[in-house]
Amino acid sequence: GVGSVVAHKCAQASLNGAFGHITLASRTESRCRKIAESIRQRYGVEISTAKVDADNVPELCQLIRTVRPFMVLNIALPYQDLHIMDACLECGVHYLDTANYEPPETAHFEYSWQWAYQDRFREHGLCALLGSGFDPGVTNVFAAWVMKHELDEVHVLDIIDCNAGSNGQAFATNFNPEINIREVSARGRYWERGEWVQTEPLSWSMTYDFPSGIGPKKCYLMYHEELECLALHLRGLKRARFWMTFSDSYLNHLAILKDVGMTRIDPVEYKGQKIVPIQFLASLLPDPASLGPLTRGKTCIGNVMRGVKDGREKTVYIYNVCVHEDCYKEIGSQAISYTTGVPAMIGAMMIMTGKWNKPGVYNI
């Protein structure tokens, strides 16, 4: 998954002196050891591993004080963001993540919980960098670059995320199944003329003709966290939306699972035990980390931005194309994890070199 990509890319960068010692920690240390062995075989770099429960702040603090890192890269679940931020504050280390906080009991995410840490991180002289993945992350950088170099005002922003790859599975997610299904099943939301407008889940769609030989694909309107930040900072913005492609097979399976209650996030009674259906479902689905050798095709993620330059209307499309097979050949991962993990490594490098190291809590 993404954690493996981040560890591999940080190890690669350490060969050039960008990073010192790396410790990879997880609730399941055996997975960390497998990643560490892959890194040793590929690059000759030794990294440490550790077992930690990211929901347990004292346990996190004990590990941080033992390792004494410059910063913590949080590639855990969004539910754990605040616990890890608390531990970083207590131990005096910088923080980075790739996804904003989401409470386990509610399928709703927003940055307000993490932005509330602004004063505490600033007072401690620590930097917390939020959303250092691809979307959010690189899509924010794309927007800032276009605003700086291509447009005087941005009137319309459409972020479009296409996975044109195939893994041959009837139903599988390319990152944590529980998080993926919660996100896709939620109501859509977009920003227009200063207000948030809600839509029913996956009720709006459009067809977009993607570059690099991908061609036309159906895209569905969703809510994605970078919209919350970009709506505040893009000069002249009138509308901002996020779109993602899904196969018919994925959507059909998802609809059936929802109809029979398997996407519920509340506990249910089963033979005297409380279980959460979506968590049980996630345990049955393929591990996203296992999909690398099975996945073929390309991803294309980018921003379509329409606005004004020198008084004239102008549209800019800035995007990235990644090939699943190339990612697997390089580090044993599919492109979804790769495109999230590489920006996390770059964000960490920017903090460690001081280029982005400013006390407080910031989005890319």
Could you tell me what each predicted segment is?
Residues R42-N56:
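Rossmann-fold cofactor-recognition segment
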